[in-house]
Amino acid sequence: VIVDLDLTPDQELLRDTTRKFLQTTVPLTEVRALAENPDGFDRGWWQRGAELGWTSLLVDERRGGGSVSEAGLRDLALVAEEMGAMVSPGPLLATNVVAQTLSREASEELASRALPDLLSGQSVAAWCVAEPGRDITADGMKMRAHRDGADFILDGVKGPVEVGGQADWFLVTATGPEGLSQFLVPSSAPSLRITPLHGLDLVRRHAEIGFDGVRVPSSAVVGVLGGAAPSLEAQLQTALVLQCAEMVGATDRVFDFTVQYAFDRSSFGRALASYQALKHRFADMKLWLESAHAITVDATRAVQSGAPDAGEVARIAKAYVGERCPELIQDCVQMHGGIGVTWEHDLHLYLRRVVVDRQTYGDPMQHRDHLA
């Protein structure tokens, strides 16, 4: 188990409360059952999570949010770790990225329309930023937005979009004559095409969202028209930190029960854990896991404080964690032997989650290329 030495009592309470809630409401048996649920999660369950603060930690107090420690991103990263440890469902990342953006940049009118229900868990938001075959960069957006009188017309395709088929609101990034802009679009908008995608994760749903001349009023613009590049960078940094925290939480749990398995399982009359070759391998794995946790905490602090190198540190974290965590879980599968590749064992649930996280919002190679 990874030990956090710098948590405040309030943060420890948030972590422990989240852990107990997840263990009680979505044990792995329930996660398997939710694989048959079209949404991948229960709306009533998500509202109960919102009551614990999951949706409001990145939102300013004047708009109904607030954190337990005045370090909202660190608090939310703790929640993400616990959700990774239980392979939990729910739109944690997407809804929080959108809620944070609306809190910071939306007009009072727009925020009052969407934020209250997002914070209460009654509605869900999707972050429509990724485009098929393209990197997430300000100059890499192919989707277009052009004026038509007092309105804007959106044309293009976004995908894969997390909770795209379940969202009530879409935060859409598009390029127009003014530059990069963002729009808040209701899922009920005409000419919106939602195509569910088959995913590896059993409970995390993605979709491709087609905007075939979707008309939105000028009041749907979030922030400054043509000035969304800094907002996009801030959103990506937040998303990468939460992804890394979730991957670390999942890998930590898998490592723990793999070590226990090595003590319980015998081979040639000896516990697996007694073999020196496996001891050395476990030591290497523990080093990589602690390193993944350390770079995630460092990235969280950098993004939380708005450090000048926050974007660089967040990308370094995703590159390292996104590479190491899937490898670590694959090693754990090997150490379990044949039982590790069965449907009945829980290992594949965790491997599915970290592989999806690795590929979403830029894989390690893409982030290394960006850093270079």
What does each model-identified segment do?
Residues 88-109:
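N-terminal glycine-rich flavin-associated loop
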Residues 70-71, 137-139, 163-167:
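Short glycine/proline-enriched turns and hinge-like loops at secondary-structure junctions
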Residues 136, 140-142, 160-161, 186-223:
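Flexible, small-/acidic-enriched active-site or ligand-binding loops
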Residues 121-132:
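A short, Trp-centered hydrophobic/proline-enriched beta-strand micro-motif
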